[in-house]
Structure formats: C-alpha cells, structure tokens
Amino acid sequence: MEDTAKIQLSPSVEDYLKGIYTLTERGDSASTSALAQTLGVQPASITGMIKRLATLGYVEHLPYKGVQLTKNGSIEALRIIRRHRVLETYLQERLGYTWSEVHQEADLLEHAVSDKLISRMAKVLKDPTHDPHGA
C-alpha cells in the first residue's frame, strides 16, 4: 500500500502506541499510571486517548489489568520504533550528531517523514538492526 493511502496518525497517537509497546515489551503492566509516567502526561489525560486508540482498533483495555496492543497496534508501534531507530542511526552516522543528541531529534522527525524516506535511509545505512543506543 502506498504511503498516501495510509491513515495519517497524529504524533500523539504514535507516541502512545510507542509508549504502550515499550511498557509491555519489558513485561510491565501498561496501566494508565505507568503509561502517564512513560509519556510524561497526567493520568487523567490517558483515559480519552485509550478510548480513541480502542476505537481505531489499536488497543484493548482490560479492566484492572491495563492496556494491550492489538495485532494492528503492535504493527504500528513497531513501524514507529523502526522509524525512530533509523533516524537516530542516520543522524549519528551520516550527519555527525552525538549519541546524546540523536534521541530528541529523532523524536521530532519520526512524525514528519514518510515511510519512503525511512526505507531509503535504511538502505543507505545497509538496513541497521540496532540504533546508536544499542537497542
């Protein structure tokens, strides 16, 4: 499917998906409080976004257990994480950013670049499997 045919997710939705994936990947509960801490937002603001993500088919909310990504949610989260890692690697290897600079810059760029650009950057980098932080 072409980039232009995909639903454009807001940076906020992408950050939530990435945050939920990160929490559940480590084996932690993706509770509203854990998610609020991970994203640096107030717990009260989490509820509305969880409902939105559930409506979009990206998460399932399990009462008293927290949030789990659906298959589609996991696919999107991994796509976003891949974008971030390719950007970090490109910024460091090709543009001379320091290790401490790449994360914040990649956080800004990951929401603004196309899948096509990420694919081309990854190709130039010989499809890296790890980011500059070793992840």
Language model segments and positions:
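Short, hydrophobic-biased segments on the C-terminal half of alpha helices
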Residues: 50-51
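Anionic-ligand-binding alpha/beta catalytic cores of soluble enzymes and soluble regulatory domains
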Residues: 95-135
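Extreme N-terminal segment that seeds HTH/winged-HTH DNA-binding domains in transcriptional regulators
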Residues: 1-40
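Basic, amphipathic "hinge/linker" alpha-helix immediately C-terminal to the N-terminal HTH DNA-binding motif
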Residues: 65-84
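A short, conserved structural fragment
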Residues: 54-62
